[in-house]
Amino acid sequence: MKTTPFTPYHIRNGARMAGFAGYDMPIEFTGINDEHTAVRARAGVFDVSHMGEIWVKGPRALDLLRYVGSNDAASLYDGKIQYACLPNGRGGIVDDILVYRIDAETYLLVVNAANVEKDWNHLVAAGERFGLRPGRELYNASDEIAQLAVQGPLAMRIVQRLCPAADLGKLAYYT
């Protein structure tokens, strides 16, 4: 089972661990009800390093995203994020994803942990149409990126204290 860079911290701090999508993940520390209430009232930090990250790069990156995605990634600007799904072409959905536009030729897709391989294969197959090659314009960085999510009504205040040089108040939704 895979671990995240934060696993030693979780264990040191008494997390109850369980398997999810091939990862040993923290399920709770002090109790699910207490933690739920804390996040709803204040904030909480979640290890979401099990999520998948796939880079799509090059002059045909947007063409691929418009072909495989349910939303129009052409409406994104640098730093903007879009929620979308990957339709399977048969009336169903491969997965729901987040599309981050880094610049006009660089996008980062965040995909669900349980679907990384399925999403990767779907993107590689579709990428052939646009000359996008695995390991080059398409790159699965899922085992190289760790993520923490700060959620709750005080999340922005907490992150602002960690990043005092950034004016997070200027960020629009999904940026």
Regions picked out by a protein language model, each given a short descriptive name:
Residues 1-175:
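Basic, glycine/lysine-rich polyanion-binding surfaces/domains
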